[in-house]
Amino acid sequence: MSQPFWQVKTLDQMTDEEWESLCDGCGQCCLHKLMDDDTDEIYFTNVACNQLNIKTCQCKNYEDRFRYEPDCIKLTRYNLPTFAWLPITCAYRLLEEGKPLLPWHPLIKGSKSAMHSERISVRHIAVREIDVVEWEDHIINKP
């Protein structure tokens, strides 16, 4: 039996389809971050992008997301090293660091239910951007 692609290929060797499938759909990338103007320190909030369906943790308009959210970040093989803020559970980060996918990952389990059960997804903490008045009141630790 052959090994899964993520165990035999580097991130650079993966097809676009394989690359996209690494995303566990936790929604952590879709939580807004605030940056301190003086220190450049990044603060994580529980404020979800307007395009995030909090229940499913999926973008409502993934293919056209940049039209709706010009500041949305596109994670690629080329800019991955610049995203040190990615959660420690992120498959892209784990593989970039030479670590295995975590046991609950949808590619291993076959569904996202284990990820939600482990409370990795933002479904239990996210609030809608439209409902937020003071973003500073929604600062959390790294998700």
Swiss-Prot record:
Pfam families: CxxCxxCC. Belongs to the UPF0260 family. This is UPF0260 protein plu2141. It comes from Photorhabdus laumondii subsp. laumondii (strain DSM 15139 / CIP 105565 / TT01) (Photorhabdus luminescens subsp. laumondii). InterPro entries: Puta_zinc/iron-chelating_dom, UCP006173. NCBIfam families: PRK05170.1-1, PRK05170.1-5, PRK05170.2-1, PRK05170.2-5. It comes from the Bacteria.
